[in-house]
């Protein structure tokens, strides 16, 4: 507190013993201790009152927002850390996990439906192409005269 070493305190104690005397020295130390205790209590009370006044006026919120504005990297890292911790807490047996599993199953079923639809469309186009080729063959046969046998 006063930045005194052991040797300085020893010298002060010896001087106090000589000046005050051994009879009154314990009473003086007790009085000094009570005074220091009261001073520390008053300092604590003053500090607590100042902190309460700062909290009531919203200074703490302003301080937090200023610190966040000064160092946005920490703010971003805090959100990343919280997201990572949320992912670590993921429980597949929870309602959210069940919904995620249902969503994945629906996505897989949608892909199966799309594949089946594409296959059906390809089969339909193939059938239409075969029918068109057969019709073209019939029309070509009707247009082309039959070959004559020359004997």
From Swiss-Prot:
Membrane topology: Single-pass membrane protein
Keywords: Cell inner membrane, Cell membrane, Membrane, Protein transport, Translocation, Transmembrane, Transmembrane helix, Transport
Record's compositionally biased regions (Basic and acidic residues): 121-130
Domain of life, per lineage: Bacteria
Cellular compartment(s): Cell inner membrane
Molecular function per GO: protein transmembrane transporter activity
Record flagged with keyword NAD: no
Keyword Acyltransferase in record: no
Record's compositionally biased regions (Low complexity): 110-120
Region of interest (Disordered), residue spans: 102-151
GO CC, any one term: TAT protein transport complex
Regions crossing the membrane: 1-21
Gene Ontology process terms (BP): protein transport by the Tat complex
Function text: Part of the twin-arginine translocation (Tat) system that transports large folded proteins containing a characteristic twin-arginine motif in their signal peptide across membranes. Together with TatC, TatB is part of a receptor directly interacting with Tat signal peptides. TatB may form an oligomeric binding site that transiently accommodates folded Tat precursor proteins before their translocation.
Similarity annotation: Belongs to the TatB family.
Complex and partners: The Tat system comprises two distinct complexes: a TatABC complex, containing multiple copies of TatA, TatB and TatC subunits, and a separate TatA complex, containing only TatA subunits. Substrates initially bind to the TatABC complex, which probably triggers association of the separate TatA complex to form the active translocon.
Listed name of the protein: Sec-independent protein translocase protein TatB
Species whose genome carries this gene: Roseobacter denitrificans (strain ATCC 33942 / OCh 114) (Erythrobacter sp. (strain OCh 114))
């Amino acid at each position: 507190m006063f930045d005194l070493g052991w040797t300085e305190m020893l010298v002060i104690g010896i001087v106090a013993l000589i000046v005050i005397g051994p009879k009154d020295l314990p009473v003086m130390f007790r009085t000094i201790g009570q005074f220091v205790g009261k001073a520390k209590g008053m300092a604590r009370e003053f500090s607590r009152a100042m902190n309460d006044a700062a909290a009531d006026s919203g200074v703490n919120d302003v301080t937090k927002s200023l610190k966040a504005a000064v160092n946005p990297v920490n703010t971003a890292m805090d959100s990343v850390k919280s997201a990572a911790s949320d992912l670590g807490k993921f429980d597949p047996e929870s309602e959210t996990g069940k919904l995620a599993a249902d969503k994945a199953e629906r996505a897989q079923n949608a892909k199966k439906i799309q594949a089946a639809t594409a296959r059906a469309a390809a089969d339909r186009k193939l059938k239409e192409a075969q029918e068109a080729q057969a019709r073209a063959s019939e029309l070509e046969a009707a247009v082309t005269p039959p070959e004559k046998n020359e004997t």
